[in-house]
Amino acid sequence: MKIYLVGGAVRDALLGLPVKDKDWVVVGATPQEMLDAGYQQVGRDFPVFLHPQTHEEYALARTERKSGSGYTGFTCYAAPDVTLEADLQRRDLTINALARDDAGQIIDPYHGRRDLEARLLRHVSPAFGEDPLRVLRVARFAARYAHLSFRIADETLALMREMTAAGELEHLTPERVWKETENALTTRNPQVYFQVLRDCGALRVLFPEIDALFGVPAPAKWHPEIDTGVHTLMTLSMAAMLSPQLDVRFATLCHDLGKGLTPKNLWPRHHGHGPAGVKLVEQLCQRLRVPNDLRDLAKLVAEYHDLIHTFPILQPKTIVKLFDAIDAWRKPQRVEQIALTSEADVRGRTGFEASDYPQGRWLREAWQVAQAVPTKEVVEAGFKGIEIREELTKRRIAAVANWKEKRCPNPAS
């Protein structure tokens, strides 16, 4: 029995990155030998065991053979005669097909170390094409390591295009698509994930609402980058700089979906694109089974992001109605989330990346003023039932009006 550290732990150690999870491969052992050594079996489809002390995963060396469609259509063979090289060959990328023995020696039969140094994401073998989920995994790795200047090998991108054209991605379940997307959205450069998917044709298949934005022009006066798809990825990049929150990043990604519905004869203007985009957000989220809290924020951002941009000319009544619309009284975090997504929208434009966004500050300040109006005083004044809410709203509007006159006066007044 020989035990090797494999995959991501070896890769990240060689890159000088923190190692989070460790996976191990056991060569020359049977399931019974693992059980006798105190390991706990957890894998149903193939033998995976938990170490009795560390609870890290130890998998018996195995091979995989395509036996059906999609990413689940594989037959696994695990036995003592499966070599380490054979186990590593089934992995997706050469940089993940690395192992380290107990003496610290690196086993690298597929030149993963060379590709690490060259900053290349390259598939191990033609078997890559048998698993459509790997298209998304490569896109995610490209996003994860974009700050290290990794790129996808030409032959790997070509294979990803072939897989997409052959309809392989249609076998992916919504849950798996969303899981990879969720992980990609939490990387330092989530926009790279969607750019890679577009480069291989997968964006049109998996995210048609986003793909439809490319080639849709916006007024050059407001959008020097012109292309709405390009702007969308720029705003996502900016959102990633402004916030680590998944919901903020996802909402930013979806903020301009409504522009994909604008008739060509109305280009480059997109009046009403915010409310129009709400149904597309709903459609995308329903198809991919996006969590409800992410969906709800994305719908609000789509509908109201342009309103935030016009904050200086908003009436106090409109500002308080906005807080009502986003349910800020029960979910106050939404004020900050919408401020961040609106800022990402403005700064996610060519030449505006370093711009100040005072509207975000004003929105936050107005919220502090509005929520500081005490409900207790309204009740003590004798108001009852629906009168309480009506009076509370009046007082909130008055408080915001007083604040706005001092801090954010209407430029037209």
UniProtKB/Swiss-Prot annotation:
Which InterPro entries does this one have?
CCA_bact, HD/PDEase_dom, HD_domain, NT_sf, PolA_pol_head_dom, PolyA_RNA-bd, tRNA_CCA-adding_enzyme
Task: Provide the residue positions that the database annotates as binding ATP.
Answer: 8, 11, 91, 137, 140
An example of a Gene Ontology BP annotation on this entry? Answer: RNA repair
State the source organism's domain of life.
Bacteria
The note describing how and how many cofactors are bound reads: Magnesium is required for nucleotidyltransferase activity.
HD domain: residues covered: 228-329
Q: Which residues bind CTP?
A: 8, 11, 91, 137, 140
Annotated GO molecular function terms are: ATP binding; CCA tRNA nucleotidyltransferase activity; CCACCA tRNA nucleotidyltransferase activity; cyclic-nucleotide phosphodiesterase activity; magnesium ion binding; phosphatase activity; tRNA binding
Q: Can the keyword GTP-binding be found in this entry's annotation?
A: no
Q: What is its EC number?
A: 2.7.7.72, 3.1.3.-, 3.1.4.-
Give the matching PROSITE patterns.
HD
Q: Per UniProt, which keywords does this protein have?
A: ATP-binding, Hydrolase, Magnesium, Metal-binding, Multifunctional enzyme, Nickel, Nucleotide-binding, Nucleotidyltransferase, RNA repair, RNA-binding, Transferase, tRNA processing
Q: Which cofactor does it need?
A: Mg(2+); Ni(2+)
Residues binding Mg(2+): 21, 23
Cite the Pfam families for this sequence: HD (PF01966), PolyA_pol (PF01743), PolyA_pol_RNAbd (PF12627)
Similarity annotation: Belongs to the tRNA nucleotidyltransferase/poly(A) polymerase family. Bacterial CCA-adding enzyme type 1 subfamily.
Q: What is known of its domains?
A: Comprises two domains: an N-terminal domain containing the nucleotidyltransferase activity and a C-terminal HD domain associated with both phosphodiesterase and phosphatase activities.
Protein function: Catalyzes the addition and repair of the essential 3'-terminal CCA sequence in tRNAs without using a nucleic acid template. Adds these three nucleotides in the order of C, C, and A to the tRNA nucleotide-73, using CTP and ATP as substrates and producing inorganic pyrophosphate. tRNA 3'-terminal CCA addition is required both for tRNA processing and repair. Also involved in tRNA surveillance by mediating tandem CCA addition to generate a CCACCA at the 3' terminus of unstable tRNAs. While stable tRNAs receive only 3'-terminal CCA, unstable tRNAs are marked with CCACCA and rapidly degraded.
On assembly, the entry states: Monomer. Can also form homodimers and oligomers.
Protein's name in the database = Multifunctional CCA protein
Name the gene behind this protein: cca
